[in-house]
């Protein structure tokens, strides 16, 4: 079951002026399931995105990248149950045909539509089911359908994921709302995740790509469930500009304030993925400090977070903490002085000076391991940089869920 995670109250997901969402059932994987989502954007909205680094990227990712270079995005279409990945030229054609059908509904050009898919890889996109369902999704468009969309984009997720924040900029109330899906094949850059965060703030087009990368770097690129990088990962930032604030044109105070709110929403969504990791029973925070740069801190944090031996030890509540030291050692950080390291499990000092801490108590460590939320802290003692990664344990259910995924 998810770790300290519940679906958001629909009333807590605030409408974003300039955004409407509609949901319908295409029956892609299961008859009657609401698995098709349309998102309509007001004219003048600005959109930026970051996508999977997997070289075997899905057809919709390729099409999204093409369409984003042309600007003026007016609609998004999202299907679950089929990834449209590993589908070659036919997959590209079906993604583009989907965009054309959506464009007809909105009376825009097909290049103004971004397609997204998530689900099983290597199976043809069932366009014969998707296209007939699009008018129903279009008829369902409403500003308040964030909660319904959060549920519609799920695959193996147990809990829908959404969050909202508000802030003041230039005397105007700015709203930020986001939804995401993902609970397996989660590892940056990025994870099997789709994330959509929208704001009504006005921000210059030249800053949008910087903003989406800044936000992804501290959120969706800091979470791992199983170390697998998906073919379909996409994080989209939308700014409708309808709040009426003076356009944010430089990376000053207003940019920083908006970035903080966007990051706050994105971090909540990213952490929800680890909390909802397939079969998860523990939520783990891996915090590495004292590095020469953030990259090496992140490198060590990920080595710990994705280690199957570390993750299974946490599932068993077994303080077999030598596995953490082993992961640090094989992380690949150059010239690392292991004798300068310190490792804590919660507040329990586990290792220092190259070995077990003098006052270490296995009973104290075992007590920490029984908690549902656990922090591992590592000090490298060679600089001021730091990085944090979120993950979960590996349980029997992780194997069961993935073994039975197609059956």
Curated annotation (Swiss-Prot):
Localization (cell): Cytoplasm
| Signal sequence annotation | none
Q: Does the keyword Amino-acid biosynthesis apply?
A: yes
Marked site, Cleavage, at: 191-192
Q: Name one GO cellular component term.
A: cytoplasm
Per UniProt, the keywords (alphabetical) are: Acyltransferase, Amino-acid biosynthesis, Arginine biosynthesis, Autocatalytic cleavage, Cytoplasm, Multifunctional enzyme, Transferase
Residues recorded as binding substrate, renumbered to this chain, are 155, 181, 192, 278, 402, 407
Q: Which reaction does it catalyse?
A: N(2)-acetyl-L-ornithine + L-glutamate = N-acetyl-L-glutamate + L-ornithine; L-glutamate + acetyl-CoA = N-acetyl-L-glutamate + CoA + H(+)
- SUPFAM superfamilies tied to this protein: DmpA/ArgJ-like (SSF56266)
GO annotation, biological process = L-arginine biosynthetic process; ornithine biosynthetic process
Q: Which Pfam families match?
A: ArgJ
* Enzyme class, first EC level, given as a word: transferase
Pathway connected to this protein: Amino-acid biosynthesis; L-arginine biosynthesis; L-ornithine and N-acetyl-L-glutamate from L-glutamate and N(2)-acetyl-L-ornithine (cyclic): step 1/1; Amino-acid biosynthesis; L-arginine biosynthesis; N(2)-acetyl-L-ornithine from L-glutamate: step 1/4
How is the quaternary structure described? Heterotetramer of two alpha and two beta chains.
Q: Which PANTHER family match?
A: ARGININE BIOSYNTHESIS BIFUNCTIONAL PROTEIN ARGJ (PTHR23100), ARGININE BIOSYNTHESIS BIFUNCTIONAL PROTEIN ARGJ, MITOCHONDRIAL (PTHR23100:SF0)
Role summary: Catalyzes two activities which are involved in the cyclic version of arginine biosynthesis: the synthesis of N-acetylglutamate from glutamate and acetyl-CoA as the acetyl donor, and of ornithine by transacetylation between N(2)-acetylornithine and glutamate.
Protein name per UniProt: Arginine biosynthesis bifunctional protein ArgJ
Q: Which organism is it from?
A: Thiobacillus denitrificans (strain ATCC 25259 / T1)
Source lineage: Bacteria, Pseudomonadati, Pseudomonadota, Betaproteobacteria, Nitrosomonadales
